[in-house]
Amino acid sequence: MAPFSAETNSTDLLSQPWNESPVILSMVILSLTFLLGLPGNGLVLWVAGLKMQRTVNTVWFLHLTLADLLCCLSLPFSLAHLALQGQWPYGRFLCKLIPSIIVLNMFASVFLLTAITLDRCLVVFKPIWCQNHRNVGTACTICGCIWVVAFVMCIPVFVYREIFTTDNHSKCGYKFDLSGSLDYLDFYGNPLENRSLENIFQLPGEMNDRLDPSSFQANDHPWTVTTAFHTQTFQRPSADSLPKDSASHSPYSNVFKPAGVASPKIPSGFPIEGHKTSPLDDSDAFLSTHLKLFPSAASNSLYEYELPQDFQDYYSLGQFTYDNQVSTPLVAITITRLVVGFLLPSVIMIACYSFIVLRMQRGRFAKSQGKTLRVAVVVVTVFLVCWAPYHISGVLSLFTDPETPLGKTLMSWDHVFTALASANSCFNPFLYALLGKDFRKKARQSIQSILEAAFSEELTHSTHCSSNNVFSERNSISTTV
């Protein structure tokens, strides 16, 4: 996920090209979301929580508004993160907290929308059961369970988010192992740091750091070279970032010439014509596209050798080999978000509203039911439009080489997808609340009471009048939205 998802998505601004147009578009979306979503959600939260009678519907939307309001409050940090080109000046705790809040909002919103959908379906198909069992207490209990599950789903974000320092700038990103994910710039620095030599370079017959030529057998490929590099995820550098003389700057040059380790001796009886005394000291031998450790003896069966395919790819292409292996926690996080946070709720919503439409076409329902259905369908549609690009790009990023055109496109527009997902928190109050006739009436009345209290010379009288008006109309409030 771009900055916080990532969501979502494992890439951060640190590893993404700074494409000005998508970033500006993302900042515009986030700014509008904050400017519209903060007062909109605040108004809904105040009116639904304090001015309207507590019903099952108001409980659903009250909790949904709370989740959206938390997301809106975190948007200024996202804007600053984009404006600073990925730098994170807020410290380690906020690096963990703010992305967690965004993910918490994501799961809480989708779970609440799913609960609202199931609730509407039960009202249509089981009206008698709902009359006996559908109450505010049950709705509050379900909302509490939803918050607990959403909190559990955001724990991996809080655990794996860490601060990285690159070029004296702090970055907020995922860290899935104790040693951290090294960037190719760090790889140039010291590839053997905190690594034991025997785990990097070994020869057959080498026991306890001693080379025993007598252990070689003539028919056992005596000079087979094996390597065992620790699993580490590196990013392929661009062509411009590599030195022109990549051979002289090869990060493997020190691996094959470790200080203090004697070069292996050629067993007696082996042909040595044209052979260098210390083949491991000859960097050209390892930079050859054919990887001939012993050029003069390449055709001799006694000098057969084997090197890992990644070394062959590296030296034949003259660049690092891109490791397509993705971290297991990242795959688990992305797939869980896709299935639990998008696919399963989407299937439930589409199925329930399809059944409701069919049922309403067969029976006679009040106009209020039709209005509720239209508002709910719009809310679900907007949710799918906002969140589908985020989840799709997250899954594609797991299986796409970032050097391909598709990979570059995903990285460039990842910020836009994340901003669009956050915009869902702005649309909800205008869709499900402000479109409702009863809510518009109560909102106008509440705003009017605020203005009267602010400008009236008789504050007590104005407040008393508005309070009486609120009390007199409570009995006429409908439970539909």
From Swiss-Prot:
Extracellular topological segments: 1-23, 81-96, 161-337, 398-414
Residues carrying covalently attached carbohydrate according to the record: 9, 168, 194
Positions carrying Phosphothreonine: 460
Disulfide bonds: 95-172
Membrane topology according to the record: Multi-pass membrane protein
Localization per record: Cell membrane
Highest taxon listed in the record's lineage: Eukaryota
Residue list for modification Sulfotyrosine: 174, 184, 315
Modified residues (Phosphoserine): 456
GO cellular component: plasma membrane
Gene Ontology molecular function: complement component C3a receptor activity; complement component C5a receptor activity; G protein-coupled receptor activity
Family under the similarity heading: Belongs to the G-protein coupled receptor 1 family.
Purpose: Receptor for the chemotactic and inflammatory peptide anaphylatoxin C3a. This receptor stimulates chemotaxis, granule enzyme release and superoxide anion production.
Assembly notes: Interacts with VGF-derived peptide TLQP-21.
Name the record gives this protein: C3a anaphylatoxin chemotactic receptor
